[in-house]
Design a protein with these regions (language model features):
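Catalytic-core regions of hydrolytic enzymes
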Residues: 20-150, 167-178, 234, 256-271, ...
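Bacterial N-terminal signal peptides
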Residues: 5-16
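Active-site-adjacent mobile loop/cap segments within catalytic or ligand-binding domains
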Residues: 26-29, 40-43, 49, 109, ...
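The feature captures the short pre-catalytic strand/loop hairpin that immediately precedes
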Residues: 136-162, 215-224
């Protein structure tokens, strides 16, 4: 009984997070970027399309898909409102969200760049931007070249714990960005501009894994037409909801272990089992499960009969 109790708890890690578990255990905050009037109304695209309207529609569709499966989903804005970056992060923190996803459309300034630049890219927080382009985008979204505010610790112990928590959240954020990029590209077949990092203020204020996805270039004539179509917005929303579920399998598995390890029912007399030392034995069981080979979601191959893209890839 003693051994089985530990192994049963550890085996939860091998199960999908939503398997046999109410999806209401998952709390997601979706952030539709920008909103309100100039200068916070976001990018203006071809054919009069506005970023703030596209991303709100996608966020609302993604919310519906996740709620249909029982998840709790909050939007940082539900209409054309100007919500500060600090308030967007506060909404996620106050909700105790498991993840935060900020949805945006990209844009280029020059006429030549607007004709040729298109595709999807996903960002996670880092004070060191991938390149000059990532740095400029962060400054644009931040409203200026502001630096990331670092949390202040009241003492050494709290500082260490805060660093550990932030470190884990940032590692998880990188994984979240990879999973989002994979699913959006797979679901829309848009051009992939990869996973990148930059100092986005809206991400710096969150205490949970977070990412920012640019679902396309609203400045590109063809991509703008796609982003305006309800059917394409549905594809993006489906891809984002699949990405959230994929990532939740990892996040909730840790929570399930913490919540599910409970004392075994008391037995009579000599049948009473020895107490399980969870602090020492559960980590060993978890390590054993963790060593089992598992496919990384971001590396899932497309079917062999998938239609090839124009560049020959599948």
């Amino acid at each position: 009984v003693r051994t089985l109790s530990v192994l049963a708890a550890a085996c939860l890690l091998a199960l999908p997070a939503w398997a046999g578990q109410p999806s209401s255990a998952l709390v997601v905050v979706l952030d539709a970027g920008h909103g309100g009037k100039f200068p916070h109304d976001g990018a203006h695209g071809a054919h009069g399309l506005l970023e703030k309207n596209v991303v709100l529609a996608v966020a609302q569709k993604t919310k519906e898909l996740l709620e249909a499966q029982g998840a709790t989903v909050l939007l940082t804005r539900e209409s054309d409102l100007d919500v500060s970056l600090a308030d967007r992060a506060r909404i996620a923190n106050d909700a105790g969200a498991d993840l935060f996803l900020s949805i945006h459309c990209n844009s280029m300034e020059t006429r030549e760049d607007r004709k040729v630049t298109r595709g999807v890219e996903t960002y996670f927080l880092s004070p060191d931007p991938t390149d000059a382009e990532a740095k400029m985008l962060a400054e644009l979204e931040n409203g200026g070249p502001e630096s990331i505010p670092l949390p202040k610790a009241t003492n050494a112990v709290i500082g260490i714990l805060a660093d550990l928590a932030l470190g884990q959240a940032r590692n998880d954020s990188a994984a979240l960005a990879e999973i989002i990029q994979h699913h959006v590209i797979r679901g829309t077949w848009a051009q992939s501009r990869g996973v990148r990092q930059a100092p986005f203020l809206v991400l710096s204020g969150t205490k949970m894994p977070s990412a920012l996805v640019e679902i396309g270039f609203i400045s590109h004539p063809d991509e703008s037409r796609l982003l305006a179509k309800t059917a394409y917005q549905d594809k993006v929303a489906t891809a984002l909801s699949n990405a959230v579920r994929d990532f939740a399998d990892r996040v909730l598995s840790r929570r399930l272990v913490a919540q599910a390890v409970k004392p075994a029912p008391a037995l009579k007399g000599s049948e009473q089992p020895a107490a399980v030392n969870v602090a020492t034995e559960l980590p060993l069981a978890i390590d054993a499960v963790a060593t089992e080979p598992q496919a990384a979601p971001a590396q899932v191959a497309l079917p062999a009969n998938a239609v090839a893209r124009p560049d020959g890839t599948r």
